[in-house]
Swiss-Prot record:
Keywords: Membrane, Transmembrane, Transmembrane helix. It is found in: Membrane. GO terms for cellular component: membrane. This is Uncharacterized protein MJ0492. The keyword Transmembrane helix applies. It is a single-pass membrane protein. The chain crosses the membrane at residues 3-23.
Amino acid sequence: MNFVIIIAILLLGISLILAFTVLNKSKSKTTMAYKRAQEEKIDTEIKMLKNLKNNVCSGASDEIIDNILNSENNILKEALKNNLDDADVCKKLRR
């Protein structure tokens, strides 16, 4: 009887370890996909700002767009480093 209980406890422990590793692996894949999506979003916004910059002719506007390009790029990259959510990034962009 004790042998059956020991085997049941071992099987339960092994199943818990396997479940934890599967969930952890899924979490890391999701995190990587999220980071990749955020990086693509940053690249898209940078391209949009560069296109806007190329379409605007005045030097003053170029300087303003350069400032926007640099500030948004830095804020978004900082957000990726700190794993901030979109709401935090939006708050920083509004400041």
